[in-house]
Structure formats: C-alpha cells, structure tokens
Amino acid sequence: MTTRQLQDLIEKMSTDEKLAQITQLNPVCFGFPYITPLTGPDPGLRIDRNLASSIGSVLNCDNASDAAAMQKAHLQEDPHSIPLLFMADIIHGFKTIFPIPLAMGCSFSPSNIEEASRIAALESSVSGIHVTFSPMGDLVRDPRWGRVMESFGEDPLLNSMLCAASVRAYQGADVRQPYHIASCIKHFAAYGAPEGGREYNTVDMSRGILHETYLPAYRSALQAGAEMVMAAFHVFDRVPASASPYLLSRILRDEWDFQGAVISDFNSVGELIAHGVARDGKEAAEKAISAGLDIEMMSTHYMENLNISLQEGTITEQMLDDAVLRILSLKNKLG
C-alpha cells in the first residue's frame, strides 16, 4: 500500500480503533490464557473483546502455531483486516543460544554478532515473530547494574559497530524477505547509566556526555536501518524517558530524522504516575503521546483516556494519526 492508501485507511478507522492499534498487550490480556507471558508481571488487564479485535501488536508469543491461531482469530474480527504484529525479546539467541551480549562484545567481532543475529532472525521469523527488541544499545560502565550482561560493553565505538552489525543481520537487505525480522533498538536513552547501578534509577549526566558517549550506539543502529526504538524506564534530565520531548522528539525526530515507531517499555506509561510527573493515567497518556511515544506496551492508558483528551483538545487528532501511520507503515513494510 502507498502512504496515501494507508492514510485513507486511517480516515476510515474510529478513534477507539486507532487507540487499540497503538496498544500492545500479551496474549493473556485478550483471551489466550494458555500462552504463558515470558516477561513482566501480570498487570491484571482484561479488555473487552470488541476492543481486542483492533489491538495493534502482541508481546511475547513465541511459537508459530499460537501466532497463527491468534492472527486468524484477529483477522476474522478486525473491521479493517489489519494484521497483528508479534514482537519479542531476543537477548542472546532464540532457539540456538549464544554467549550473552557482553561476552560477544569481548570478541570485538562484528561478524560474530552478525552470524548470531542472522540465526536468531531465521529461528524467530519461522516462529511467527515480526519484531525483536534487540539489540540493546545501552553503554554500561557500572558493573553493579543488573542488566550489564545485555550490553555489548563500555566503549562507544565498539557498541556502535556491534549494534549496527546486529541490525543488519536481523533485517537483511530487505526486511520483507523470508527469515528476517525488524529490529527495535533499546532502551532510549542512556538506560545503562543509572545512579548507583540500581535498576530504574535516575540517570544524571550532561547532555555533552549523553551525545558523545551514550547516544552513538543508538544512532548507529538507526543508520543501519533499525525500524523501531524502545524508550527507557528511567528519568533523564528530570523527565522520564517515556515522556521526554527532548529524547523522543528533538533528538530522534528533529536531529536524527527517525521516521519509525517508538514503543514504551513494559507499563512505562503507567509508571509516569509513580515518577510523579502525571496525576493519573489520563495525564500520563497525554504526556507520553505528546512527547512522541507511539505504542503503549502492557498498559491501557491510551485506550482508556485519549478519546477524552481529544475531545478536550489536550492532544490533537494529528498526533494520534501520526502514531497510527508509523505502525501501519511498518506492517506494510513487513508485508
């Protein structure tokens, strides 16, 4: 489909359908309780079947038969026959297990990373996965942080080279071709530098250090063609990354001209309330989408609140349509 055809499709969608399209839930949340979630707590979300029929993407359904069953049921119910996207974490291999990224980084070998990512793409694509939340571009220099092993290490140049190698292998020359998947670089930005090495903690650094040391790996991944970006959990410069116009709009959109979709991490829109920057789910949703966050993962504040926000004028229809277009464009690109 052309961009004009995708825009025409968006014009036919109701507001509720658009809000469902920019929401990602795991299979349990909309009627597939036998598919065990692979990550995160059960948030207790159970949504109306009519809304479930328009959900845009699924988190961590990792086998072909379940994915096919979900897709078939979804396409029978979705009023516009818009397919689901299936997304999953691939940390160090899918079925074939490789050394952790930190160990792979010690090889100083982009070709090793390419081979591991190529095999993971092959195995995951035939298991029904369209997008992986990988590679992790977070540069790490504090061994106390509990996710050090998911990073390629402490050097900006090496991280940049290895992230780009991983993206190239996941996506191939044409991501639509068999045995390839789209790459989502994470966690934007500087998630690997929390104070005291404590997970989810505040990241406090100058913007100069951010740009010189911590951003190059993400940018390298995007220059290699990564289709998506995941926003991080933490606070940077006193604003949570999931609601940061500086990170998600000024850097990603304005400076780097990134045109793809940006997704939250697990329930990070809801966590804006715990951060103290939003009074409730409505304000959290407004701040996130206004900052440039297209997809809400594993919470439903967009679905529950943004219809009212549109009526009140605190967000615009264009913001919503832009987010939906980015998602539909990726689905179209993946075939």
Language-model segments: residues:
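Glycoside hydrolase catalytic-domain context in secreted enzymes
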Residues: 1-335
